[in-house]
Amino acid sequence: MCQVEFEMACAAIKQLKGPVSDQEKLLVYSYYKQATQGDCNIPAPPATDLKAKAKWEAWNENKGMSKMDAMRIYIAKVEELKKNEAG
């Protein structure tokens, strides 16, 4: 796996037309953040901001995962979503 494949997956996810569940969106987001920034480095948002809190928790669950592992998982998840869309 390399940076080019990751960048291609980042572009491909923007082209998806089919429905993607909120849970899948959170997973993809969390692996993207881990791959590009590493461990979550921002304070937890207030519990009243449900969307931001969910995104923070999803990213924070990947703590300790290497950027390369996160890239691999991100690429695999995007491929899975593309296959599901194709039927």
UniProtKB/Swiss-Prot annotation:
ACB domain sequence ranges: 2-87
Matching InterPro entries: Acyl-CoA-binding_prot_CS, Acyl-CoA-binding_protein, Acyl-CoA-binding_sf, FERM/acyl-CoA-bd_prot_sf
UniProt entry keywords in alphabetical sequence: Cytoplasm, Lipid-binding, Transport
A GO term from the CC aspect: cytoplasm
One BP annotation, GO: fatty acid metabolic process
Principal subcellular localization: cytoplasm
Bilayer-crossing regions: none
Gene Ontology molecular function, alphabetical: fatty-acyl-CoA binding
Cellular compartments annotated: Cytoplasm
Protein residues bound to an acyl-CoA: 29-33, 55, 74
Function of the molecule: May be involved in the energy metabolism of the mature sperm.
Family in the record: Belongs to the ACBP family.
Protein name (Swiss-Prot/TrEMBL): Diazepam-binding inhibitor-like 5
Source organism: Bos taurus
